[in-house]
Amino acid sequence: MDNPSIITQVTNPKEEEILSCTQDKVSQCNISLKKQRSRSIFSTLFCCFRDYNVEPPSTNSTSALPPLVEENGGLQKGDQMQVMPIPSPPAKYLLPELTASDYGKKCVVIDLDETLVHSSFKPISNADFIVPVEIDGTIHQVYVLKRPHVDEFLQRMGELFECVLFTASLAKYADPVADLLDRWGVFRARLFRESCVFHRGNYVKDLSRLGRELSKVIIVDNSPASYIFHPENAVPVQSWFDDMTDTELLDLIPFFEGLSKEEEVYSMLHKLCNR
């Protein structure tokens, strides 16, 4: 779309059918994860051609108010199950040097929208936060729902890992939401849309640009397109919108407690999806 939206989300399945073909390909991983948890992780491993002639998102404004939803998650028809080599590391990394308190810990990159929270410009009666966002000189209220058990999840993750918030949404929305959500200072860094790579219509989180050893990096995200460059590092989760009985984040804690003790992440993630 010509005018980038404020919030990057996947489509709510209540409103339209989504990615049914893609979901079929990941059922095997979901089955193995169900053996460890009562609810499945929406698990996917993708490989694709990588285009290094990246086009930046257009900034031409053609409408007064950007739409709420910038969809991120659909893969283009040309994205076949093949892998291209990762390019040389960038001269400047996205993350600062590791602090002494995080030395020896793995880095967990955590998505925001539909992973930890769900946000809407439409009023939500039970919203946990209401965040004012300025768009074209007008203040709009964004209503934010916290995913069940997000507090317990973040607190435990902060104890086990170097945690980084990485969202394809804009900082003007995501930063104040993170201020309200992360009361414990779990996130050592926050990365927003400008830190993503715009690839074939999606905002991709290129983990090679973080400045961390990839064998010790995990990404937690509901959108397969977000980690399409590094699917072997992903712990996918189901998109969350408003189900207050959801326990996915709570169910993930034991898995991450085990993963934190591993020398590298690939073996455990590979075994998990190949049982």
Curated annotation (Swiss-Prot):
Catalytic site residues? 111, 113
Record has Ribonucleoprotein as a keyword: no
Q: Where is the protein found, in the record's own terms?
A: Nucleus
> Gene for this protein?
NFI1
Give the reactions, separated by semicolons, that this protein catalyses: O-phospho-L-seryl-[protein] + H2O = L-seryl-[protein] + phosphate; O-phospho-L-threonyl-[protein] + H2O = L-threonyl-[protein] + phosphate
Please indicate which residues carry the site annotation Transition state stabilizer: 167, 205
Q: What SUPFAM superfamilies does this protein's entry cite?
A: HAD-like
* InterPro entries according to UniProt: Dullard_phosphatase, FCP1_dom, HAD-like_sf, HAD_sf, RNA_Pol_CTD_Phosphatase, TIM50
The name of this protein is CTD small phosphatase-like protein
- Annotated NCBIfam families: HIF-SF_euk (TIGR02251)
Q: For this protein, what is any one GO molecular function term? A: metal ion binding
